[in-house]
Amino acid sequence: MKFRKINCAVMFLLLSISIQSNANTLPADLSWENNNNAKPWASPLATKGGKFTDFILTFPPTLRTVGPDSNSSFRSYINANQLGLTDFHPNTLEIIPQIATEWAYGQDGKTVFYKLDPSARWSDGNPVTADDFLFTLDFMRSKHINAPWYNNHYTNEITSVKKFGDHTISITGRVAKPKEELHYYYGLVPTPKHFYKKIDKNWVKKYNWKIIPNTGPYQISKIKKGKRITFERKSDWWAADRPLNKNRFNVDKVILKVIRDTNIAYKHFEKGELDSYALVLPEFWHNKAKGKLYDNGYLEKFTFYNNSPRSSSGWFLNTDNSILKEKPVRIALAHALNFDKVIKTVLRGDYERLQAFHTGYGEFSNKNISARKFDLKAANKILDEAGWQQRGGDGVRISNGQRLSLNLVYGRKEHSDRWSILKQDALKAGIEINLRLQDSSSHYKTIMQKQHQIASLGWSTGFRPAFWQHFHSENAHKPQTNNITNLDNKNIDKDIEAYRAETDSNKRVKLANALAQQIHDSAVFIPSFKVPYTRGAHWRWLKFPDAPGTKTSSTLYSPFGDGGIFWVDSKTKIETKAARKNSTKYSSVNKTFDQYRENTSD
């Protein structure tokens, strides 16, 4: 063991910092809230035990949740088991407790005080303390994590985290915000200081496959690289008896198998090797989810309407490309794509056209914006005026020797039919679209490196419209940021900064609507589809509450986060397997739940 000498001056400084961090005094006029009366959304009939097996399309490139290659879909499984201070009730959007048991608001409008649950524990048994939240700030500001968005947010948006003893903290943001937004924008997740100890230049590589201590109900227990990842429920989880956690997180194990093809995955489901299967895709719902397994009641179907912000799904145009940097080309391309035809044919009328990047955010969404309609006459006129009059023998336009030929990268094989239709109609306007199907991992890396021309994908949603990460020039022309169109517009930058700084709700709404219009006008994003429901099928041994989901449920089969309300009935599982062998039949089940269905289209 090595010992390092510390001179007296440094020792005095360290002691001073330590004493100062514990010497902060809470304001005397704080009014503490807890929302302990929030209504649970689980069922008292739920039982513990069993396993839930699902699939993922690709093995994650890392277990890190920040830094290079961390923004994959698998990150959501890890984040869902890392609790924050508070959360939003999935039905009412009220603030509800997580690691914090109580909270209070400072008079400055930008500070929230939190009392931490003294019983909160990391998965390795260590207590969660105020120091873990202070360490989060140091961690997220470190250049060694190689995460520009987090560096910026935790440096410029969160100005301080103060400690008032081991179990009380305050967080102060850059500007005042409405109370519910303070929790969303300035809320912190603790980082295990005892585990990391220090962050250095080797951090990204060192922690690529480390299983980090967490605070949620499950922890990764087994990894078979390239094959599967298993999460196991903690038998002594510190928050298990919280009222909002009772009767939730019921299965003992969650197994995620890597199956790189959705059709093959569906065959695994029919064999009983997967417990559920999402059937949002019309091809699966109409063509595959039928037959004896459904007629005999072994597999049960459902459609569940939700009411929440819609994924920003569509085509993202990279303005760093020599062709797509021309705004007229981008507008013409939007007019050359017949999304309505795709909806009526391939999608069987099951989907709706998404109208704008931010949809479903109430008054924060600009409802006056409509996606550009299919109009070949308009597309041809725009391209002619933009200098693309000449056409080659194949009908593709040419300007200064360059063909109007663009590559579309996408990561789902089952989307090929819809893009083929768009490709055919675009050619009528003289635009060649080359379809480039990639596996999920390659698709993600291509986009994050900004190596695409056109990318098809959908972003997850948030509490309020997010502009800075997607459209501010600070995130353009560099890899590993979410501005995948490389939009670089100083006027838009100015309004984004004003939106982030504004404290008045009405003014923020106006700014959000104005920004939505500017983004539409820039034509860097072509909206595709929205789906106002989730639907799927599961083996009859999966049981649910009377309300099988919440207002904001994007799937009924989420074992983590605000999900975890289903359970496995072991007796029914044994009965069902026996029934299949002797051809015993049950009543077929195909239910629709529409209590949260929107009354009007957004």
Question: At which residue positions do the language-model features occur?
Answer:
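Ligand-site clamp/hinge motif
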Residues: 206-209, 237-289, 423, 427-440
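Surface-exposed binding/hinge segments that line
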Residues: 115, 150-198, 217-224
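Aromatic- and charge-enriched surface segment that lines or borders ligand/interaction sites
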Residues: 101-146, 170-172, 258, 265-268, ...
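Extracellular/periplasmic solute-recognition and catalytic clefts
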Residues: 143, 147, 221-232, 257-321, ...
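Alpha-helical secondary-structure segments
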Residues: 53, 129-136, 168-172, 178, ...
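Gly/Pro-rich hinge or "lid" segments in bacterial periplasmic/extracellular proteins
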Residues: 82, 89-94, 186-248, 253, ...
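N-terminal lobe/hinge region of extracytoplasmic solute-binding protein
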Residues: 26-40, 51-107, 138, 213
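Detector for C-terminal structural segments
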Residues: 35-37, 56, 77, 224-229, ...
